[in-house]
Structures are given as structure tokens and as C-alpha cells.
Amino acid sequence: MVQVWYMDTEETDQRLEHHRNPPAYLELDDLYQKTGVEYFKINADEYQSDNTLTELRAKRGYTYDDEITCSEKCLPDYANKLKAFFTEHLHTDEEIRLILEGSGYFDVRDNEDNWLRIKVVKGDLIIIPAGIYHRFTLDTNNFIRTRRYFVGEPVWAPHNRPADEMDCRKSYIKHQSENFVQFNKV
């Protein structure tokens, strides 16, 4: 089950947990209200026939998917890719990830610009909304295999911060000010 907490401000090894002292955890409902990030539990061993995933794909129009493995052995240009993933950025489309194996962290900004760390493991599916500042890193296991979902042809174009003038960012801020009440939650 996914865990979420407020991060400390240490700039040591990004793969560590980085809890505040004392630790400050968030419930999934609070994560959604603060960030619009959605979470679903999926049977990773039988994801092709998982009803929740099938429903999500139909309702959200996810017509393309692929798989990516992040490890030193499997990812070409590993060090530079991890650096790019951990650079704070946003996307014009939502980012949908199903964890098939391994673990890692998605960090997202809340409405007060604090970092929230989301630990993802096998069976976790998260949807990072378009326009939210975020980043990704592996944990100390240094391995994750994920299924990525897209509406149409895949576009993974990061827009590094600052990108506040982009339409997707303005739309995100509007939804955030409304606690994501009228957002896409399925």
C-alpha cells in the first residue's frame, strides 16, 4: 500500500526516505485534496484483466501503454536519465504509472510548495495530474519496472520549473484552489 509523507529539506542521497523529524504522514484523501494525485491498487500479476484498470483506461481514454525498467543494467544512459527524472518539472498531460516490480518515489508539491514523498511499490497505480510540479527517483533498491499509460501516442515532455505561465499549470492551480472537487476522479 502506498505511503505518503512530508519530506525534510536535506539534500543528501535522493534515494533515502527523507522523513521530517518527527515524521508527518498523509492519508490518501489528503494527498488528493492537496495535490490531485490519484491512487489505485491493481493486481500487478494480472493487470491485463484487472477490472479497475480496465475501467480507468476506458473512462480516461488511455489507448497506448508501454513498459519501462529503471535499473543500471536496463536503462541506457542510466545516470543522466535519473538526473532528468529527479529535476523538478511538470507535464501537459497526466502521468500514469503502474508499478509491476520494485519500488521508488514520486515527489509532488503541495499548495504551500512543500515536497510530499509518495513511496510506490508493486501494484500501486498513481496518476500525477497535468501541471503539477513533481519528480521521480528510485529508492535504495535501485530497481523499478512500470507500465506507463497515455492518451494517444506517448508524449513525455518535461517542462522544468519555472513553468507557471503554461496553460496546464494555470488549470492545475485553479483545480487546486477548489481542492480538486471538480477534477477527474474516477
UniProtKB/Swiss-Prot annotation:
Binds either 1 Fe or Ni cation per monomer. Iron-binding promotes an acireductone dioxygenase reaction producing 2-keto-4-methylthiobutyrate, while nickel-binding promotes an acireductone dioxygenase reaction producing 3-(methylsulfanyl)propanoate. One of its GO terms (molecular function) is acireductone dioxygenase [iron(II)-requiring] activity. PANTHER family: ACIREDUCTONE DIOXYGENASE. It holds the Pfam family ARD. Keywords: Amino-acid biosynthesis, Cytoplasm, Dioxygenase, Iron, Metal-binding, Methionine biosynthesis, Nickel, Nucleus, Oxidoreductase. CDD domains: cupin_ARD. It catalyses: 1,2-dihydroxy-5-(methylsulfanyl)pent-1-en-3-one + O2 = 4-methylsulfanyl-2-oxobutanoate + formate + 2 H(+); 1,2-dihydroxy-5-(methylsulfanyl)pent-1-en-3-one + O2 = 3-(methylsulfanyl)propanoate + CO + formate + 2 H(+). Catalyzes 2 different reactions between oxygen and the acireductone 1,2-dihydroxy-3-keto-5-methylthiopentene (DHK-MTPene) depending upon the metal bound in the active site. Fe-containing acireductone dioxygenase (Fe-ARD) produces formate and 2-keto-4-methylthiobutyrate (KMTB), the alpha-ketoacid precursor of methionine in the methionine recycle pathway. Ni-containing acireductone dioxygenase (Ni-ARD) produces methylthiopropionate, carbon monoxide and formate, and does not lie on the methionine recycle pathway. This is Acireductone dioxygenase. GO terms for cellular component: cytoplasm; nucleus; plasma membrane. It comes from the Eukaryota. The keyword Cytoplasm applies. The keyword Cytoplasm applies. It comes from Drosophila melanogaster (Fruit fly). It is an enzyme of class 1 (oxidoreductase). Ni(2+) binds at residues 89, 91, 95, 134. Its EC number is 1.13.11.54, 1.13.11.53. Belongs to the acireductone dioxygenase (ARD) family. Disruption phenotype: Viable and fertile. Females display reduced fecundity under restricted dietary conditions of 10% yeast. Fecundity can be rescued by supplementing their diet with methionine. Pathway: Amino-acid biosynthesis; L-methionine biosynthesis via salvage pathway; L-methionine from S-methyl-5-thio-alpha-D-ribose 1-phosphate: step 5/6. Fe(2+) binds at residues 89, 91, 95, 134. GO terms for biological process: L-methionine salvage from methylthioadenosine; methionine biosynthetic process; methionine metabolic process; positive regulation of reproductive process. Its cofactor is Fe(2+); Ni(2+). It is found in: Cytoplasm; Nucleus.
